[in-house]
């Protein structure tokens, strides 16, 4: 366990953005270990969680800023974004509006954080009630962002957004975790068939993208 700041080789501010209810807080609090600390900053209306990841470059700390519901009040204060080194933008695949609002969140974020690594994450892919299909998720391709399906409640692909961000921030594409992230027991088990179906849909979407056949966000089928 890392107990002190001297053991940490790098420290980064990571902000979570997206509509309320998409699962941002659940996503962060899946990390269950003594190295996870959470504190509330009243002046900003946010929770800041400290997550230490053990990598091939040493221990790296993320200070993860979560909105604490402030996004429901009509936007976030600039102080939320200032000094951010990276961001995870999250939507809920069972709610179309949360995906349609992603361009607004991206605009707010990049107005202050122009060139930080950003991962777009579609949460709740464990649900059979998905309203946002892989071929409809096109925003990341237009903005050259990384995208991952995740399920906070089943821990599906939990590590991938963090590992991608770490590689970007350190400039080391070969960086890896030397210890898995300690996670809470799953609330929902995803079947192998569900996972295979997700992969098949994303392979199909990638092929369509290469052929220039993916719909725009404004496409009628998405509204």
From Swiss-Prot:
Assembly: Monomer. Found in a nuclear export complex with RanGTP, exportin and pre-miRNA.
A cellular component term, taken from the record's GO annotations: cytoplasm
Keywords noted in UniProt: GTP-binding, Nucleotide-binding, Nucleus, Protein transport, Transport
Keyword flag Secreted: no
Region (Switch-II): 69-85
Annotated source species: Tetrahymena pyriformis
Name the UniProt record assigns to this protein: GTP-binding nuclear protein Ran
Predominant cellular place of this UniProt entry's protein: nucleus
Stretches for region Switch-I: 38-46
